[in-house]
Amino acid sequence: MRPWALAVTRWPPSAPVGQRRFSAGPGSTPGQLWGSPGLEGPLASPPARDERLPSQQPPSRPPHLPVEERRASAPAGGSPRMLHPATQQSPFMVDLHEQVHQGPVPLSYTVTTVTTQGFPLPTGQHIPGCSAQQLPACSVMFSGQHYPLCCLPPPLIQACTMQQLPVPYQAYPHLISSDHYILHPPPPAPPPQPTHMAPLGQFVSLQTQHPRMPLQRLDNDVDLRGDQPSLGSFTYSTSAPGPALSPSVPLHYLPHDPLHQELSFGVPYSHMMPRRLSTQRYRLQQPLPPPPPPPPPPPYYPSFLPYFLSMLPMSPTAMGPTISLDLDVDDVEMENYEALLNLAERLGDAKPRGLTKADIEQLPSYRFNPDSHQSEQTLCVVCFSDFEARQLLRVLPCNHEFHTKCVDKWLKANRTCPICRADASEVPREAE
């Protein structure tokens, strides 16, 4: 096992060691990327100043041991070791996930350092940052393809852009942090790379091979654990100043809202990575338009009642004293007189409704005798009862006979005979 090899994380405890992919130096072949206990790489023998490193590998532990037990069994002491690209140009590669091409697997990992020879990285040790002329000794591998981390945005790797990296046992910040600035360095020149590594432009968004897809605050933690015990985890800290970046590389810090931070870098599987879309909606803050003015009142129309009444043939006195019409009184009287004449012609002469008591008594009457009765009428039409002996009957000028009480009452209200409708008052005068 090489001392700088790292293993894929999020493997279940029962996963065999052969399924975990490791990364090696630039001189290793693709077949040597699979970790085996018997292989030794160029990084197996570090520089001469690390003399206290053990020469053989510690005994391998069963793969089913949890990470907490491995951390508990890790040694507490060790000699400090400096990591700098000038002294060690071996690449530092991480296989984030091997199954990313099979589906949208969320990248939720925690970055930890892994050592295979048992020497720790003490807390006080500083890891100097790299400049733009020197590529960092680290890269990320997605499904067998290597991604140089120094070309990615600064929040992805803190060892290349930040000031220092002390190694306390704390949690590593998010892979894509919520810093208030987005670092935009100028595009560096493509450095020479080994044959087994893919070209730099294939993964960096310097070319237009892959579409730029924004990732909005992916809360991802990369956890890199190997078979060997881990002694600490990288932690971003700005408590002490570190080596400054090269003055030839100007850095432009652009202010940006942390809630809407977008980092764009081309990755072949960027469309498979989970992204948290911003659901904040902006509402247009504009004052509401003033309400429309009320409609104007309808125009005043004078009443048509006086005009309508003036068209009627009526006298102004009948309308009442409140209505005064400018009409000639003589003309009105003449019209009324003519109207009355027309009415009299249609009605005829005015006659009283009934006969007076004197007129009624002038009509002849007699006592009914059945033996001497000569008329064919035997009953009274008013009361519809038969004549009886010794009853008083009244005879009208039309020779119709009735009971005296019945016909007198009828003649007081009517002037005609109840049977033939003849005038009861004319006949006697003509007879006289």
From Swiss-Prot:
Protein name as it appears in the record: RING finger protein 44
Zinc finger (RING-type) residue numbers: 380-421
Cited PROSITE patterns: ZF_RING_2
Location of the region described as Disordered in the Swiss-Prot/TrEMBL record: 1-86
Lineage: Eukaryota, Metazoa, Chordata, Craniata, Vertebrata
Assigned keywords, A-Z: Metal-binding, Zinc, Zinc-finger
Biased composition (Pro residues): 56-65
Organism whose genome encodes this protein: Homo sapiens
Cystine pairings recorded for this chain: none
